């Protein structure tokens, strides 16, 4: 039996509980949160009786194997290092840390510990994406020349997600003082991870960040100063070029990821408009000698989720992806985007 503790009992933690609880041989034995009301509600909802208000107390008194770090972003580093020092495997929500230096510290600590470490880049769960990555990595598309990727949401311009000026789950994401790195740190880390995993590392980037003024200056203690959209031109280490962008004001696009990778022997694309559950296909063309350029849609059976990969890694001792190294690389790109936008120039990564 693999025993887990969940640290942080906000809304995302429900998905962690449900996913891990559905895996045979896994038990959530304790939960921890400084917010007593959140802790009580989460424990009542999921039937977890053992609760802690302090991570120190959890590590000192509870017998378990691994943690799910679902705390706010600014606590990811501290909790992650604390868990590794206590000999616990770590499954961390993204981003791995608030900057690349902190992320590297976590990578080194994980390597020195020999413990299993993973970052929950949710959309790696999409089987269509995994199929696409396998095709690209196999070399079937030849030399990769072009990569274009977007991640668009509409919650600043529609009420599909709710009313962003009335709910704290939206408000903090718009305020740097509340720990937000804007859309770049929220969904940008996802799309950078998705673009680089099949193709390889980005060599240099030119990025422009935008704060939209139409939403107002802020609400109460929340000042709306975090970036709402960004556009980036990129060059990969392998010579490929492309564009990557994200927006929270993309009216009509609920939660839409679109990735297109083009080589000299073919092209491949994935697109899903909800969560990873509808990303079960990819489209591919190898018809380079025809004027029609026929695209074929390929269904991919469900691949293991990050949650399942984490548990399998603990059981086998072999660390699957996406690990802390992937999380650090994504954060390195995010840091470069901030620098590029501020200095209005290309930045080497």
Positions of PLM-derived features:
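C-terminal helix-rich "cap/oligomerization" subdomain common to oxidoreductases
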Residues: 1, 6, 26, 66-69, ...
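N-terminal Rossmann-like dinucleotide-binding module
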Residues: 1-46
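Short, Asp-centered acidic motifs that coordinate Mg2+ and/or phosphate
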Residues: 30, 50, 66, 146
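Conserved SAM-binding strand-loop segment of SAM-dependent methyltransferases
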Residues: 48-55
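Beta-strand-loop-alpha-helix segment that lines the small-molecule cofactor/substrate pocket
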Residues: 66, 72-73, 77-124, 139
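Predominantly a Rossmann-like dinucleotide-binding segment in NAD(P)-dependent oxidoreductases
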Residues: 123-223, 344
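Contiguous beta-strand/loop segments that form the cofactor/metal-binding neighborhood of enzyme cores
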Residues: 166, 192-276, 306-316
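Active-site loop of classical SDR/Rossmann-like NAD(P)-dependent oxidoreductases
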Residues: 296-308
């Amino acid at each position: 039996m693999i025993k887990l503790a969940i640290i942080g009992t906000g809304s995302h933690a429900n998905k962690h509980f449900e996913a891990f609880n559905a895996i045979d041989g896994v038990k959530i034995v304790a939960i921890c949160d400084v917010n007593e009301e959140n802790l009580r509600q989460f424990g009542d909802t999921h039937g977890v009786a053992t609760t802690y208000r302090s991570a120190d107390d959890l590590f000192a008194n509870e017998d378990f194997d691994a943690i799910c770090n679902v705390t706010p972003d600014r606590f990811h580093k501290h909790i992650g290092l604390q868990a590794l020092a206590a000999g616990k495997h770590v499954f961390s929500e993204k981003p791995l840390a608030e900057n690349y230096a902190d992320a590297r510290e976590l990578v080194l600590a994980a390597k020195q510990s020999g413990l299993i470490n993973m970052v929950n880049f949710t959309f790696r769960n999409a089987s269509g994406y995994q199929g696409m990555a396998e095709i690209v990595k196999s070399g079937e598309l030849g030399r990769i020349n072009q990569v274009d990727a977007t991640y668009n949401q509409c919650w600043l311009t529609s009420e599909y997600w709710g009313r962003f000026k009335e709910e704290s789950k939206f408000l903090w994401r718009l305020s740097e003082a509340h720990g937000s790195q804007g859309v770049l740190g929220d969904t940008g880390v996802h799309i950078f991870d998705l673009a680089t995993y099949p193709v390889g590392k980005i060599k240099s980037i030119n990025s422009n960040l935008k704060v939209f003024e139409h939403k107002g200056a802020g609400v109460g203690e929340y000042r709306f100063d975090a970036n709402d959209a960004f556009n980036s031109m990129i060059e990969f280490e392998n010579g490929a070029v492309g564009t990557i962008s994200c927006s929270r004001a993309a009216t009509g696009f609920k939660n839409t990821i679109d990735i297109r990778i083009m080589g000299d022997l073919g092209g491949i694309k994935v697109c899903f408009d909800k969560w990873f559950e509808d990303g079960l296909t990819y489209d591919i063309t190898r018809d380079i000698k025809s004027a029609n350029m026929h695209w074929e849609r390929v269904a991919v059976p469900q691949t293991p989720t990050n949650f399942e990969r984490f548990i399998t890694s603990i059981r086998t001792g072999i660390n699957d992806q996406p690990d802390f190294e992937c999380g650090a690389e994504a954060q390195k790109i995010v840091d470069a985007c901030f620098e590029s936008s501020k200095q209005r120039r290309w930045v080497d990564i």
